[in-house]
């Protein structure tokens, strides 16, 4: 295929509201992972102005799996990472694509392929990166704000009535910090084991 024909075919495949209209001949599907990996709303995976679209991307990969004319995936990654759930689900979907179809994935890492972007990239049979690509940075973070001082200064009193000791996490106890740390450690270990 010429570059123009391939670009037109990719545009045709991805244009419209989740419309999957692949070319009549063999083709390589392009999966864009651009921006923060989390669920957002948009109608086309070609439109990267709003960032990565999780459900749209997952549906697109399902369509590629079902299409015998598809001969592989070019995975374009330009992402600093994102949510643990969506990153791991995307990784697992790409692994499923390879295992189900036996077709290859080629990964191209652009500006960033860090954290969840790295997790996604490692599904490639071949990985290509620019010499200036920022990659790696595997890790998991959970954070929040302690606004108690501000509330006190403004005269705002927080009241919480719960059905269990660990239901309210607005004023973290040592036990709750340990629980959250255990969850972060577990997610990190899953990441390392990929």
Residue ranges and their predicted role:
Residues 1-103, 112-194:
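Small-residue-centered hinge/linker elements
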């Amino acid at each position: 295929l010429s570059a123009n024909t391939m670009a037109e075919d990719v545009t045709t495949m991805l244009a419209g509201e989740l419309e999957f209209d692949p070319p009549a001949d063999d083709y390589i599907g392009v999966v864009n992972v651009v921006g923060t990996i989390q669920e957002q709303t948009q109608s086309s995976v070609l439109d990267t102005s709003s960032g990565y679209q999780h459900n749209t991307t997952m549906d697109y990969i399902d369509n590629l799996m079902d299409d015998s004319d598809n001969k592989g995936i070019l995975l374009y990654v330009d992402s600093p990472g994102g949510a643990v759930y969506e990153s791991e689900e995307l990784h697992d979907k790409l692994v499923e694509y390879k295992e189900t179809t036996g077709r290859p994935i080629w990964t191209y890492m652009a500006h960033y392929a860090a954290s969840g972007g790295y997790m996604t990239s490692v599904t490639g049979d071949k990985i290509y990166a620019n010499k200036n690509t920022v990659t790696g940075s595997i890790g998991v973070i959970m954070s929040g704000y302690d606004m108690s001082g501000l509330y006190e200064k403004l005269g705002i009193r927080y009241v919480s009535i719960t059905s269990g000791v660990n239901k309210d996490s607005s004023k973290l106890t040592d036990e709750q910090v340990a629980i959250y740390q255990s969850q972060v450690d577990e997610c990190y270990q899953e990441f390392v084991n990929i």
